[in-house]
């Protein structure tokens, strides 16, 4: 049976989803699972949780723990699949730094993990560590597949695909939830009759086609989206709204609380949490996979010192990721006992791609995914060295991406503004030149629309110094 190594196993809830999925999959349930982390306590907590799930599933898997860099190569040795979920530098201090230093220069961010100065420095902290993984993998498991879940997805996956020989695919759940989110929030409902075509780049892939029983849904989507952004779409009672957004499935308490808060906000003010994406769709013609808080900082249109009223108009949550980190830490404290000390803990297979990919490669039964891969002629009006997100087929032969051809030109043009930053950041990680970091941040759409070149250079110098313990030297 296969060996699955999970890098960053201290990401306990995510490890439960991915590895719990594997243990619930007949083709993978007898796997040898290697948990690797540099944090002893989090590693132990994840192991306790997964061992309980395994016992309640008949103890079919073998679970092993590997702590610290000295054990990394052994964790990887003989692996068939490697799942990457690391965060270099963590929330405190690195995420805090990614927000606070730019804020001194008047540059505000929402998430800062994929693009912008925050995304660039997150990549520069992470790429050297992932290349260390790659060097170990080239020695002890050269034929393994690396399934990367860590952001910034395009930068990290692109670096692995161009700077190592390791077979890598980047995975992001925003593809799976794109059409259901859009149709349910517009009260159109989502079901298995809906067919979609999605392609572009990670967090900015485009819903190119959306049909139900062959009928193009876009005309009605755009009609309702305009009403929704004007606060005029009738969304029903709270009970009706909750059932629509959840597809009738039970929700964790904290999710339901946030949905209710957003429902009340819309009823009171006409504002909601997806206004940026719907505005971009109405302007560019197509809906984008990732959330509005992300896309607010991928473009130069919404977070602007000169137009502070846009923050309220489009309901943009500045500094959202630090708040989210604090909330997740608090929620983990409340769930710790439930997940690590519950002898009856079980798991139901989630929608995360990882176990479905492994199952397809083990059994030969193909599965369609949205994967991040190198653009080798797949999207013909995007750069060939870009990391693109396209439909892929997974089976015993690995990952076979789909050729899309040209995107609508306005969609490709917006993608290219993000790709410029991604490629320049990977180049900075390769050259270790400070000037290439400056160039990556200078090319960022949001940063360049707000700051002068001199301020960008000064900000980068401060960031480099603050992150010195997590980044290699730059000349």
Q: Predicted regions span which residues?
A:
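Short acidic low-complexity segments
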Residues: 63-76
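Rossmann-fold NAD(P)-binding glycine/threonine-rich loop
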Residues: 92-162
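Glycine-rich phosphate-binding loop and adjoining beta1-alpha1-beta2 segment
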Residues: 24-58
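An anion/phosphate-binding loop that grips the pyrophosphate of nucleotide cofactors and donors
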Residues: 79
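N-terminal Rossmann-like dinucleotide-binding module
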Residues: 2-29
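Internal, well-ordered domain-core segments that constitute the primary functional module
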Residues: 133-221
């Amino acid at each position: 049976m296969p060996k699955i190594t999970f890098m960053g196993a201290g990401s306990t809830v995510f490890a439960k989803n991915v590895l719990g999925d594997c243990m619930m999959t007949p083709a993978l349930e007898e796997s040898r699972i290697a948990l690797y982390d540099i944090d002893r306590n989090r590693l132990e907590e994840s192991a306790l949780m997964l061992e309980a799930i395994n016992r309640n599933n008949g103890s079919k898997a073998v679970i092993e723990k590997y702590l610290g860099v000295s054990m990394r190569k052994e964790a990887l040795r003989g692996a068939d699949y490697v799942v990457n979920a690391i965060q270099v530098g963590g929330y405190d201090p690195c995420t805090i730094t990614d927000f606070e230093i730019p804020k001194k220069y008047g540059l505000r961010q929402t998430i800062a993990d994929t693009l912008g100065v925050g995304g660039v420095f997150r990549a520069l902290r992470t790429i050297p560590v992932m290349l260390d993984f790659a060097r170990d993998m080239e020695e002890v498991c050269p034929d393994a597949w690396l399934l990367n879940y860590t952001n910034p997805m395009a930068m990290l996956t692109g670096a692995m695909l161009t700077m190592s020989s390791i077979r890598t695919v980047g995975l992001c759940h925003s593809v799976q939830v794109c059409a259901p989110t859009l149709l349910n929030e517009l009260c159109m409902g989502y079901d298995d009759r809906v067919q979609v075509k999605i392609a572009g780049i990670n967090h900015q892939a485009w819903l190119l086609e959306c049909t139900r029983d062959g009928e193009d849904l876009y005309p009605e989507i755009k009609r309702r989206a305009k009403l929704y952004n004007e606060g005029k779409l009738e969304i029903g009672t709270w009970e009706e709204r909750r059932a629509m957004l959840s597809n009738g499935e039970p929700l964790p308490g904290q999710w339901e609380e946030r949905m209710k808060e957003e429902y009340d906000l819309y009823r009171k003010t006409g504002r909601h949490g997806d206004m940026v994406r719907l505005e971009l769709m109405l302007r560019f013609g197509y809906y984008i996979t990732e959330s509005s808080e992300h896309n607010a900082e991928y473009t130069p249109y919404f977070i602007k010192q000169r137009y502070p009223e846009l923050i309220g108009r489009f309901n943009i949550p500045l500094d959202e990721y630090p708040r989210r980190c604090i909330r997740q830490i608090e929620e983990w404290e409340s769930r710790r006992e439930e997940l690590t000390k519950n002898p009856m803990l079980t798991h139901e297979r989630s929608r995360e791609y990882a176990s479905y990919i492994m199952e397809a490669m083990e059994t030969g039964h193909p599965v369609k995914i949205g994967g991040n891969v190198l653009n080798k002629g797949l999207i013909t009006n995007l750069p060939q060295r870009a990391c693109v997100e396209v439909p892929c087929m997974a089976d015993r032969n690995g990952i076979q991406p789909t050729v899309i051809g040209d995107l609508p030109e306005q969609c490709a043009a917006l993608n290219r503004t993000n790709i410029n930053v991604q490629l320049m950041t990977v180049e900075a990680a390769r050259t270790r030149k400070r000037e290439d970091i400056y160039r990556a941040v200078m090319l960022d759409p949001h940063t360049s629309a707000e700051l002068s070149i001199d301020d960008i250079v000064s900000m980068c110098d401060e960031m480099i110094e603050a992150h010195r313990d997590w980044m290699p030297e730059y000349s």
